[in-house]
Amino acid sequence: MTRRDVLLAGLVAVIWGINFVAIHVSLEHYPPLLLASLRFLVLAIPTILFVPRPRVRRRWLVGYGIGFGILQFAFLYLGMAAGMPAGLSSLVLQASAPFTVLLAAVFLRERPGLPVLIGVAVALSGLAVIAGYRGLAVSVVPVVLVLAGALGWAIGNICSRQAKPDSPFRFMMWMTVVPPVPLLALSLVVEGPEQITWALADAPGAWAANVGLAYTVVLATIVGSGIWTTLLARNSASSVAPFSMLVPVAGLGSAWLILSERPSGWELFGGVLIVAGVLGPYASNRVNRIRARTSFTRLRRPVEKEGWVRSELSGIRHSLER
C-alpha cells in the first residue's frame, strides 16, 4: 500500500470509530433493525434515480450488500441494543480483520506475508487485552451478535474484492439498494408495526437521534465506505483489512469523550498494540523498499565508475594511436 492509501485507511478508521457513538445515540430512539433499514433507505432512493449502475457482476453486488450491509449492521445494531457499549462494540467488530484474512486465504488464494501475519497477531493481542479487561462486564449474547456482524463485514470485503468495480463509489452506492427491504421486513417481524410507527411518528422531535443517523449516512457510509471500497479495489484484502483494527482506538476514545466511557490503562495499552500491529507491516515494507533501493544504488555506482574508467582508457588509447 502507498503512503496515501495508508493515510486514507487511517481516516476511515477514525470516521467509523466515532460512528459507534452516533449509533449509540440513534438507538436511544429507533429500534435497531428499523434504524439499520433507514440508514440505507436514505441512500438507496437517490442512488436508483441518479447514480449509474456499476459494471460488476450482480452476484458480487448483492453479496456485498448482504455481507457488508445486512449481516454486519443487523447484528451490530442488535448487539448494541442488547447492551453492548459503544466503545467495546467498536473493538469486537474488528474481528472482521482476521475473518477477512482467513476468507481471502480460503476463497481468493491470497497468501498473506509474514509481516502481515505478525501484524495481525500483535493486533489480536491488543484486542484480547481490551476484551479481557472489559468483556466480563458484558453478557455473552451481545458479544456473539457483534461477532456475527464482524463475519458479515468480512464476507462483504471478499465480495468487494471479487467485484473489482470500475467505479468504487458507484459500487458502494448501489450496495445500499440491497439492505433496506430485507431489514425492514425483519423489523416488522422482530420489532413489530407498533414500535416502528411510534419511532417514526416521534422522529421529528428526536433531533439527537437524527443527527446521529445523518452522521452514519453521510460520513460513515458515503465517505467511509466509499474510501474503503476504493482501497479494496486497488490493494489486496489482506493488506487493507488489518486497518479496521484502528477503529476501536477511535471508538474507545470518542466514547470516552462523549459518553464518559473512560478507558483504563490496560485498554490504552491494548490500543497501542493494535496500532503497532496495523502499522507494523507497512513500516516493514517501507524499510525493505529503502534497503532494496540503497543496495541497488551501491551496486550501480561501481558499474558506473567502471564504465567511466573504460571510457577514459579508450580515449587515451585513441590519442596514442594518433
Task: Write out the residue ranges for each language-model feature.
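Juxtamembrane helix-entry segments on the extracytoplasmic side of multipass membrane proteins
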Residues: 1-5, 29-33, 37, 54-58, ...
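Hydrophobic alpha-helical transmembrane segments of multi-pass membrane transport proteins
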Residues: 10-18, 22, 62-82, 103, ...
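Small-residue-rich packing faces within the transmembrane alpha-helices of Major Facilitator Superfamily
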Residues: 17, 37, 41-45, 124, ...
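Hydrophobic/aromatic residues within transmembrane alpha-helices
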Residues: 26, 35, 79, 106-108, ...
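Hydrophobic transmembrane alpha-helices of multi-pass small-molecule transport proteins
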Residues: 41, 47, 103, 112-132, ...
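Transmembrane alpha-helical segments that form core, pore/gating elements
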Residues: 43-47, 100-101, 137-199, 203, ...
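Cytoplasmic-side transmembrane-helix entry/capping segments in multi-pass membrane proteins
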Residues: 58-67, 112-123, 142-143, 166-176, ...
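Membrane-interface capping segments at transmembrane-helix boundaries
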Residues: 282-297
